[in-house]
Curated annotation (Swiss-Prot):
<keyword id="KW-1133">Transmembrane helix</keyword>
<comment type="similarity">
    <text>Belongs to the Tim17/Tim22/Tim23 family.</text>
</comment>
<keyword id="KW-0813">Transport</keyword>
<dbReference type="GO" id="GO:0000325">
    <property type="term" value="C:plant-type vacuole"/>
</dbReference>
<keyword id="KW-0812">Transmembrane</keyword>
<dbReference type="InterPro" id="IPR039175">
    <property type="entry name" value="TIM22"/>
</dbReference>
<keyword id="KW-1001">Plastid inner membrane</keyword>
<dbReference type="GO" id="GO:0005739">
    <property type="term" value="C:mitochondrion"/>
</dbReference>
<dbReference type="InterPro" id="IPR013761">
    <property type="entry name" value="SAM/pointed_sf"/>
</dbReference>
<dbReference type="GO" id="GO:0005886">
    <property type="term" value="C:plasma membrane"/>
</dbReference>
<dbReference type="InterPro" id="IPR001660">
    <property type="entry name" value="SAM"/>
</dbReference>
<keyword id="KW-0496">Mitochondrion</keyword>
<dbReference type="GO" id="GO:0009941">
    <property type="term" value="C:chloroplast envelope"/>
</dbReference>
<dbReference type="GO" id="GO:0042721">
    <property type="term" value="C:TIM22 mitochondrial import inner membrane insertion complex"/>
</dbReference>
<feature type="transmembrane region" description="Helical">
    <location>
        <begin position="135"/>
        <end position="155"/>
    </location>
</feature>
<comment type="subunit">
    <text>Probable component of a protein-conducting channel made of HP30-1, HP30-2 and HP20 that mediates the import of transit sequence-less proteins into the chloroplastic inner membrane. Interacts with CEQORH.</text>
</comment>
<dbReference type="GO" id="GO:0045039">
    <property type="term" value="P:protein insertion into mitochondrial inner membrane"/>
</dbReference>
């Protein structure tokens, strides 16, 4: 009889969960799934050795840059080169990142974004933070890479240095402006486990309810239907949350030890 009752409860919970997922916006479902994959990938990548992480980040940045560059090259006309002074060709080639054909722009943007992402990754791993110095060094490196792929070895060294310095200055200015005008959202460490639970259940929109009721992570083993009702969480989500806590070995153990 006990097993039948437990089976009925499980089927009821699964039915409620299925209903909640059906009612969830498809775009929201995709965002949640993408966030889970992104978080898992970043967690895996952070555990790899520095050369592996740098190579993966550089490759991803290069692919992203190539896609953007190819798209821009498709939408913009290619600059004609007939009758141009050969001495000015190196400088002209460097200006074609924004006016060249799809392949030219894809190559140039791949070099810029790939090298920038790779150097920034290495700097962050070594220094343990993202700061102005890391941003400037990454931008300088991407400027050198851009000069090499756009003008080749025939380009004058001073042009490459000037271009790289320009990249570094612009990146430094944008970094400081970003620090001034943007306030990065810092996740509250007291709600980490609750946030993860709600994300798994597709109920992340109720995180504000948890914070409003001060239902921090230490209170999770003590949660009751009435406590969730007091913070205006509907019956369906309440069932899912309580069932999740009941199935979590660690939370269930704490709940039993307090009872």
């Amino acid at each position: 009889m006990g097993k039948d009752g437990e089976g009925d409860k499980k089927r009821e919970t699964m039915a409620v969960m299925s209903l909640m997922k059906d009612q969830q916006n498809p775009i929201q479902q995709f965002q949640v799934k993408f966030k889970e994959i992104e978080t898992g990938f970043k967690s895996w990548l952070s555990k790899q050795k520095l050369p592996v992480e740098a190579a993966v980040v550089t490759a991803m940045g290069g692919v992203q840059g190539a896609f953007i560059g190819g798209l821009m090259g498709t939408l913009s006309p290619e600059m004609p080169q007939a009758g141009i002074d050969p001495q000015a060709m190196a400088s002209l080639k460097q200006t074609q990142a924004l006016v060249g054909g799809p392949l030219v722009q894809a190559r140039n943007f791949a070099a810029i974004t790939g090298v920038n992402a790779g150097i920034a990754c290495v700097m962050k791993r070594i220094r343990g933070k993202e700061d102005l110095e890391s941003a400037v060094v990454a931008a300088f490196g991407s400027g050198v890479a851009y000069s090499l792929v756009s003008a080749g070895l025939q380009g004058q060294p001073m042009n490459a240095i000037t271009t790289a310095a320009g990249f570094a200055v612009f990146q430094g200015v944008f970094f400081k402006l970003g620090e001034r005008f943007s306030k990065p959202s810092v996740e509250d460490p007291y709600y980490t486990r609750g946030r993860s639970m709600l994300l798994k259940l597709g109920l992340e929109k109720y995180e504000k309810n948890f914070k409003k009721g001060l239902l921090a992570d230490p209170t999770l083993p003590l949660l009751t239907d009435s406590a969730l009702r007091d913070v205006s969480i509907p019956p369906g989500p309440r069932l899912l949350i309580l069932d999740h806590i009941q199935r979590d070995p660690e939370l269930k153990g704490k709940r039993g030890s307090r009872g």
